[in-house]
Amino acid sequence: MTAKKTNELTSGRLSVQILLYSLPLIASNLLQVMFNMADVAVIGQFSGTAALGSVGSTTTLVNIFTGSLLGFGGGISVLAARYLGAHDWKDLHETTHTSLVLSLALGVFALALGQGFSPLFLRLLGTKPELLPGAVLYMRVYLLGMPGAALFNFGNAMFSAAGNTKKPLQYLTAAGILNIVLNLFFVIGLRWGVAGVAAASAISQTASGLLLLRALIVSGEEYGVTPAHIRLTRSKVSPLLWLCLPAALQNAVFYTSSLFVQAGVNSFDATMVAANAAAANADPLAYDVMAAFHTACASFVGQNYGAGNKERIRKSYHISLAYSFGVSACISALLLLFHRQFLGIFTSDPAVVQAGVTRLFVMGLSYPWSAFMDCTIAASRGLGKTMGPTVIVLLGSCVFRIIWVYTIFAYFGTIVSLYLLYIVSWFITAAFEIVMYRRYFHEQTSIFKKKPVVA
């Protein structure tokens, strides 16, 4: 590996580097949002309301599976970035190949679990009986792409750790275009309906994963993959699982807790439920753009921790936080300014638009503040600390929200009292995360006269 590539995150002007690193991630995340919207549009327009309802009823379950893989990949990126920063090529090589085996194992486990228990999971999630057959079919076909998705998240983690966020974007774009073409072919041409949309997703996920794996094999970089060396290295399994499993668990539980919020929304009339669904389309626009800066934070902190550069760790956190907050504030301002136009994309019913304005305003004023929670968690992970931040976010953003639904919301019974749980939980969680990060920062950087601890 060349020194230029290895030190890309450990030298240079941080404000420019973090922005350039994050822009391809932002594009990738927004592409995923648009491709998901395309899936919904195709099935809704050409297969009818029942098919759309079947696919829509799987959203939470799909998020649990994909979120777990995404969290696992985030842990891989942190450890790889640290070894890159420390120029520890032997440990990096072993981590790369052990990560590949573990990622594939998780993908196969998700596939097997979903194939066997999708009907049970969907019933537990309250899927309507008339939608259940289509939802089960969608899940079983969609989950065939889990090993491919695991490969993509592994490859994305390795390239991102090395500062190369453009390569995953290229393959994601190609896979997204393939997904749309296959959607149209399977749903319109072959009339496969729900199965067609799921098959298109599974094939495109597998294609993107295999392409990214091939790119790692032919890269010739220290973080690349050598097929003959693909094996588990026992000494790397524990550090990887310690970093990856809490992040995967956090994502899974986080999406599970959203069921209780949805139950609160469902207690209102159909207009409010539809309004919530329309306004909720703003969430990924804000969250996914912010997530790019949080990924950057973890990678920059991780590499500079490996390099023993205390000041760049501090600045990486502060600059990433400023970008995340600032960009989200701009998105929120646009949503508040053009709220009716935005909601009009998803519904033409004036009553639904009017009801959706409430959620859009409450959430629009809340989005930027989540940066203090998520970016701080990313910084702690960059320092190799995952269990503490995970426990805090599970208590603050999951357990607290469930308690809020059954106490504050139950008492006031208004939609605003339900939506306010987001910003309150973010403030509480962020406060504890910041205190914990400051402690981690001082603990971890105090050892820089020695070799950084990676376990």
Regions found by a protein language model. Give the residues of each.
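Short runs within selected transmembrane alpha-helices of multi-pass transporters and secretion channels
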Residues: G73, Y142-S160, P168-G176, V197-L212, ...
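Helix-loop interface residues and adjacent transmembrane-helix termini in multi-pass membrane transporters
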Residues: M34-M37, F46-T49, Y83-A86, A161-A162, ...
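Short alpha-helical transmembrane segments in multi-pass integral membrane proteins
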Residues: M1-S22, A80-P147, G189-L245, V301-S366, ...
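Hydrophobic/aromatic residues in alpha-helical transmembrane segments
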Residues: L23, D39, I76, F117-S118, ...
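Transmembrane helix-bundle signature of multi-pass secondary active exporters and lipid flippases
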Residues: L25-V78, Y142-A149, S238-N304, S324-I331, ...
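Hydrophobic transmembrane alpha-helices of multi-pass small-molecule transporters
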Residues: I64-G67, N179-N183, G209-L213, L285-D288, ...
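Small-residue-rich hydrophobic transmembrane alpha-helices
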Residues: L52-A112, A149-P168, A275-F338, S370-V393, ...
